[in-house]
Amino acid sequence: MGKTISFSAIILVFLLVSTGLMKQGDAQAQKCEWECKLLPNFPCWLKGAGEGLCDNLCKYEGAISGVCVSDPHRCLCRNRKPGCS
């Protein structure tokens, strides 16, 4: 009985985690959001200058905007096209 409950709990946790990852993966698969190729692992520690650099280089890559995110530190390029939220 205990093994069945543990197995069910593991399956439930797996489904919850995979659902959250799938939403993020869908955005990346549709090319709605990707990490800036010119600034991999960019910490955006320069505040306005870092955010401006992120935005400019993402636009150079064809995105509509670039956004600095802090967890984990990186520069994300975002596209606005049908299917992207």
Swiss-Prot record:
One GO biological-process annotation of the entry reads: defense response to fungus
Report the source organism.
Answer: Arabidopsis thaliana (Mouse-ear cress)
Q: Which family does it belong to?
A: Belongs to the DEFL family.
Location (main, coarse) = secreted
**What name has this protein been given in UniProt?**
Defensin-like protein 11
Q: List the taxonomic lineage.
A: Eukaryota, Viridiplantae, Streptophyta, Embryophyta, Tracheophyta
Q: What are the protein's UniProt keywords?
A: Antimicrobial, Disulfide bond, Fungicide, Plant defense, Secreted, Signal
Per the record, its GO cellular-component terms are:
extracellular region
Source taxon at top rank: Eukaryota
Disulfide connectivity for this sequence is 32-84, 44-68, 54-75, 58-77
Q: Kindly indicate where the leader peptide sits in this chain.
A: 1-29
Subcellular location, record wording? Secreted
